[in-house]
Amino acid sequence: KIFSKRHNWRRKKIMNKLVINIFLLILFSNNCFAKDELKFFIGKNKIDLEGYFIQGGYVKGKTSSKIKIKFENRDIYLGKKNKFILGFGRDYSEVANLKFNIDNKWVNKTLKIKKNKYKIQKIDGLPKKFVSPPKEIYERIIRENKLIAKVRSLNSKIDYTFQDFLLPANGIITGVFGSQRILNGKPRRPHYGIDIAAKKGSKVISPTDAIVRLSKKDLYFTGGTIMLDHGHGITSVYSHLSKVLVKKNDKIQKGDVIGLIGSTGRSTGPHLDWRINWFDQRLDPMMFIKNK
């Protein structure tokens, strides 16, 4: 009986914690949007678009046959089954231009992009050197930013992007995409990811199959950092890690442990900063999670 009571108490405690985490996930996430669909024909070619036509969102597309596509003057790669993806950054304009080549002529399709609403987040207690870096650190920051930009420019012909994404860590959402950040009382750039707070050493997993494109133990702002390539211009970043467990060019599978949560770089406590880009467009990671 004592064992049974103890077992039930533990089970109840776990369920309560799970309910609280789900509530906080809904409370703190900007992602309360339903997916939209858009279907149309370009000549005889049927085009299907599905996703989030909103700042910070993305849409996945499919064509009935091979066709040349441009989006904002970028050539779009068609993968297996003629699938492709487009992304709209945090401050994307209200109109997006998608072009299709029919008989050597470009046909324009205008997409309407909704405006998003963003929160304000105040973070105090950061070391001064991370809020206003000393001049002698500038070259290092520029060099590290170039490494990150190089990975984000990749247009790999792999289709992992179309897998359902897993949440890369268990924990509490403490920071949301797009929020305007005030660090130690000073306005700074918006937050381009989500923060998942958890105990130091908690596991971080890959949300899909991927290729490791960057693996660093100590970047200035982000500390232990991993960048994964999912294909079609979609890359993801995992920051502030206490341990990096994968190497550059490793091919990893969905659910593989890639690192451990920490508080390295510009951080006030152990958490994962998870970000997703479509090339240079910053996207809301929570929009990639199927069962939110």
Enumerate the predicted regions with their spans:
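Cleavable N-terminal signal peptides
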Residues: N21-I22, C32, G178
